Regions:
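Conserved, well-structured core domains of diverse proteins
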Residues: 1-130, 136-140
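Generic amphipathic alpha-helical segments used as scaffolds and interaction surfaces in large
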Residues: 40-43, 128, 150, 207, ...
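Hydrophobic alpha-helical transmembrane segments
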Residues: 60-65, 145-152
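Short secondary-structure junctions and interdomain/linker hinges
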Residues: 63, 121, 154-157, 174
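C-terminal ends of transmembrane helices
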Residues: 85-94, 146-151, 226, 231
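Membrane-interface loop-to-helix entry segments
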Residues: 99-106, 130, 134-137, 147-172
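Membrane-embedded alpha-helical segments and adjacent helix-loop junctions characteristic
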Residues: 123, 143, 160-163, 171-235
Length: 235
């Protein structure tokens, strides 16, 4: 059987499937098919406004940079906020409206960056990066939000891998851990303070590269794709 005949057979089999089955197959392989299709203009306007702010923010900090921790926190927080509005909790959820708890997650995502912006001076100068109870609460909340946002977009694999590495520092001092993999005992402040209050954890070099280069590259590509310049570039 030739390759063209195989393609015809696959196409014929696909046409025999119901719309629901076709949508299920598309959703499995196409991430964009999982997003919500808003029935009202209000939520669509809010999402568009946040996306425009997100783009303008990255252009602004290119010329007027903020402290690395703050700009990376905003980058992650607004990205998460958009995920909670655009991606449903699970595939069978109603995709024409945003659930109340998704609005709550949206606000908490923004709060994760807002706290670092408001408390930045106290964190860096007054406390020298040593976390207090409120810091730890916001750190744990931010980690949970990131894991949930990753699950909605990519599935369970990445969040589970992240959880394994997150749990490891809490158990790495026990005697049943192989000697070469043992570490000293860490507490919540050590782990979540490092992850949330410094640029070696959640807001590390990878996020820095996303803020400074990757997002701008994608933004420029999206601009070209939606403008007439794309047709000229193909000439």
């Amino acid at each position: 059987m030739t390759k063209k005949e195989q393609e015809r057979n696959i196409l014929a089999e696909t046409e025999m499937l119901s719309e629901e089955q076709q949508a299920e197959i598309l959703e499995k392989f196409d991430t964009e098919s999982k997003v919500r299709k808003f029935s009202g203009k209000r939520v669509a306007f809010i999402v568009a406004a946040i996306a425009i702010f997100y783009s303008l923010f990255h252009l602004y900090i290119t010329f007027y940079p903020m402290p690395a921790l703050q700009q990376r926190a905003v980058h992650v927080a607004v990205g998460m906020a958009l995920v909670f509005l655009i991606y449903p909790t699970y595939s069978s959820q109603n995709r024409t409206r945003v659930a109340i708890y998704d609005w709550l997650l949206f606000l908490l995502a923004l709060a994760s960056a807002g706290y670092l912006i408001v408390e930045y001076t106290n964190i860096v100068t007054t406390r020298g990066g040593i976390p207090n109870t409120l810091d730890i609460v916001f750190a744990i909340m931010t980690v949970i939000l990131i894991l949930e946002a990753a699950r909605r977009v990519t599935g369970w694999i990445l969040p589970v891998l992240a959880l394994i590495f997150l749990v490891y520092p809490f158990i790495s001092h026990y005697s049943w851990i192989p000697r070469k993999m043992m570490t000293r005992q860490y507490d919540l402040g050590d782990i979540f303070g490092q992850m949330y209050l410094k640029t070696e954890g959640l807001y590390s070099t990878a996020i820095g590269a996303s803020v400074s280069f990757i997002f701008l590259f994608i933004l420029f590509g999206a601009f070209l794709a939606k403008s007439e310049w794309a047709s000229y570039s193909m000439i």
